[in-house]
């Protein structure tokens, strides 16, 4: 049976105060969760059930977002762009194209929600009841924007897309999803999806190697030997955790991100290509693209100071050029320091030698004698004696 899928991203016009399904101006479905974007995970799940031909229609042009240009999609996924007002018309036209190409069933899903559904079971439910359109619902019977449409149901498909997935032309028995569901409407939902993946509550497996129980590292991730990582935690591919940094309480650091020296990151998601500055405390938030969303206060702010929240170059060539420039700036300083340091050490030794004409610092001859004898017996003449443990 020829089964195809249409995935939709966007297509909503939220009112003031309603969730936008975006972080900054980027759809949550396009952001990484434990090393792989939500849309990639959905496409991967469809392929697992034999649905390998997908059309992805989004109302966010990749040309306007450099981050979106860097994402990788399956070669069998056909990406399309439509303006927000034209997205539903584009979806209807894509359904017609799928039917003309021989599709017998079409799965329609708006991201929106991340749903772990058994597509084989849902399709069998649809066929057994000879439905034209079958909609999925969660365990509380709340509707999900997930449908299976028969190729013959062209009028039903037109009604569905024209109503923005809000109305069915003919009633049918819904299919209840027993798996994991995340509505993915705000940054807090994105954070919960990542944390649930770390705790194995869903099928979002971290992309990388579990080096210790609950601690995952992606390929080429670098953690300084003086940094601390407390499980559960994830550090994505190419990311850097610098000296004295602390990663704890389910923190997720996505690919090519940097956590600078001495920064504490607790119960936080650091999004890809983000540089978190030195000496900061990032707690209970989502950080990235020069923005911070505090989960407890439900507030999202833009940060203009790159020393606090910066952006790593997206292009590998740009990252290599930056690293090379930093190396060439570092080497002359080290070479100069290597030549100058021996001379400075010799000067320090000469200055530390006692002068024959200098008067004693202590007036008591007995104390002077005992002190000088003990110093001579334990240490060379160019060492200064200090108390090791304070005043005790």
Listing of model-derived features with the role each one plays in the protein:
Residues 1-80, 364:
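N-terminal glycine-rich phosphate-binding loop and ensuing alpha1 helix
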Residues 53-59, 135-138, 286:
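Short internal beta-strands
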Residues 63-141:
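Conserved beta-loop-beta/alpha segment of the NTase-like Rossmann-fold superfamily
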Residues 143-156:
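Conserved beta strand-loop-helix elements of the APE1-like EEP
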Residues 155, 159-250:
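Extended, small-residue-rich solenoid/repeat segments and analogous flexible loops
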Residues 209-318, 322:
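Structural signal for interior beta-strand "rungs" in well-ordered beta-sheet cores
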Residues 288-392:
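C-terminal segments of enzyme domains that contribute to small-molecule binding surfaces
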